[in-house]
Amino acid sequence: MKAYQREFIEFALERQVLRFGEFTLKSGRISPYFFNAGLFNTGRDLARLGRFYAAALVDSGIDYDLLFGPAYKGIPIATTTAVALCEHHNIDIPYCFNRKEKKDHGEGGSLVGSELKGRVMLVDDVITAGTAIRESMEIIEAHQAQLAGVLIALDRQEKGKGELSAIQEVERDFGCGIVAIIKLADLISYLSEKPRMEAQLAAVSQYREQYGIEA
């Protein structure tokens, strides 16, 4: 685990974005942890968040031409990532995002920001069912652009209805790389270093045994 990944886990815990307990997911599963990126909700939070996304993206080595933030959660994430890439890595990358409702006045259209073209890095918080990715792909393909990859905060490394995770299904269906700041394996590694979090480690490890994908 790299330093920025450890720092991100601590940041998420500090802001209560990452919590431990018993949480019922949309799938009906009872998860021992929950990640809610919507709680990164101040200017300082977003500035720090962008630095972690930028670090993971640079670390990935994937080539891309533009950041795309799907409405709504992806919009501030793509924006702060673009700023962090410029300020901390001297990489000036265009970005754009979509509107849920198309405008018929002013500049019109369903996209805001740079022209959607070339190799697109889609930026979001997490992938659960992959539905948002598939919706975004319709927009990307409609503009004759290509999906270079998907950048998210957390990969739960968890099976969907079959043996694959939602992320693995996206990789299979669209042939793109998925970049996550942290994976469940990183979280377990972090917990194993903290004696006071032994109970959380046991619960998360048991959950992975039951629902985790094969490495």
Swiss-Prot record:
Coiled coil ranges (UniProt) are: none
Q: What enzyme category does the UniProt record give? A: transferase
CDD domains linked? PRTases_typeI
* Residues noted as binding orotate in the record, renumbered to the chain: F34, F35, T128, R156
What this protein catalyses is: orotidine 5'-phosphate + diphosphate = orotate + 5-phospho-alpha-D-ribose 1-diphosphate
Question: From its record, what is one biological process in GO terms?
Answer: 'de novo' UMP biosynthetic process
What keyword terms does UniProt attach to this protein? Glycosyltransferase, Magnesium, Pyrimidine biosynthesis, Transferase
- Domain of life, per lineage: Bacteria
Q: Which Gene3D superfamilies match?
A: 3.40.50.2020
The coenzyme or cofactor needed here is: Mg(2+)
Name a GO CC annotation attached to this entry.
cytoplasm
GO molecular function terms noted in the UniProt entry = magnesium ion binding; orotate phosphoribosyltransferase activity
The family database entries (Pfam families) matched by this protein are listed as: Pribosyltran
UniProt: 5-phospho-alpha-D-ribose 1-diphosphate binding residues:
26, 72-73, 99-100, 103, 105, 124-132
E.C. code: 2.4.2.10
User: Which SUPFAM superfamilies does the record match to this protein?
Assistant: PRTase-like (SSF53271)
Pathway listed for it is: Pyrimidine metabolism; UMP biosynthesis via de novo pathway; UMP from orotate: step 1/2
Q: Which family does it belong to?
A: Belongs to the purine/pyrimidine phosphoribosyltransferase family. PyrE subfamily.
Summarizing the function annotation, the protein's role is: Catalyzes the transfer of a ribosyl phosphate group from 5-phosphoribose 1-diphosphate to orotate, leading to the formation of orotidine monophosphate (OMP).
Oligomeric and partner information: Homodimer.
Name it: Orotate phosphoribosyltransferase
Taxonomy, top ranks, is: Bacteria, Pseudomonadati, Pseudomonadota, Gammaproteobacteria, Alteromonadales
